[in-house]
Amino acid sequence: MQQADMTAKIASGKGFIAALDQSGGSTPKALLGYGIEESAYSGDDEMFGLIHQMRSRIITSPAFTGEKVLGAILFEKTMDGTVDGKPTPAALIERGVVPFIKIDKGLEAEANGVQMMKPMPDLDALLSRAKGLGVFGTKERSVINLANREGIAAIVKQQFEVAQQVRAGGLMPIIEPEVNIKSPERAQADQILLEEILKALDALPEGEQVMLKLSLPEKSGLFDPLVDHPKVLRVVALSGGFKRPEACVELAKNRGVIASFSRALLEDLRHQMSDEEFNASLASAIDEIYEASVDKVPA
């Protein structure tokens, strides 16, 4: 797949984006969900080795192809690793899946009801390395806990500044200002976020595009103006703590928004499964998320 093919696939392809980008902090939880206790490994190297085995098993599964999975978001160590003897991004591209990389370095402490992204001093070097490996885009996450306009405006400003740096590095940014679905002010936070993103999009130069990864809104259809915006390549949704059936029901209510699920994709997979069981379970999850993304049919 050339750059133009990847852009076209992400812009209008039928399917969803798999999020396989758990980082150091969330890896023990991901492994536990997969059926591997913390006592089964010692030290980061063993931990990352196990999570890489899990991701390799997913990526090489017969169901994990570009037919239903448009793209996959990787953690930096996964990007630098190999699958079937090939660099992970190349292995994905071979399967028709567009590679993205998570670039943020975690969250600052909460202030003004939000958590900004920590500084990324080595971002240009990472972007250059990712570009060299055939990666198409990036993803960067911050979190909104309360409907504080000052805080949300600061989050959006920071996200679009990082996106500009990503575009300058030749990659497509996925901007992810996650609204905490447990927030007591969720609906108001969704609305303020929409307004601030629209302002930032209008300020982008003509011809520039970004992607958006957003929490499923409390009010269905709220993000229609973003789906229709010429400066947005695609709007994707995170599962944000919803279990897969619930996430798919919510997703199906939102026109033009496709999934970019992590936990909701992987929640039924277990280390102990035979390959046959594992592949069947993953195929079932992919089908369910595909239908909610494309056909807008909740499971």
Regions found by a protein language model. Give the residues of each.
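Eukaryote-skewed repeat-based solenoidal scaffolds used as protein-protein interaction platforms
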Residues: T138-L212
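Alpha/beta catalytic barrel-like cores
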Residues: M1-F136, I144-L146, E196-A299
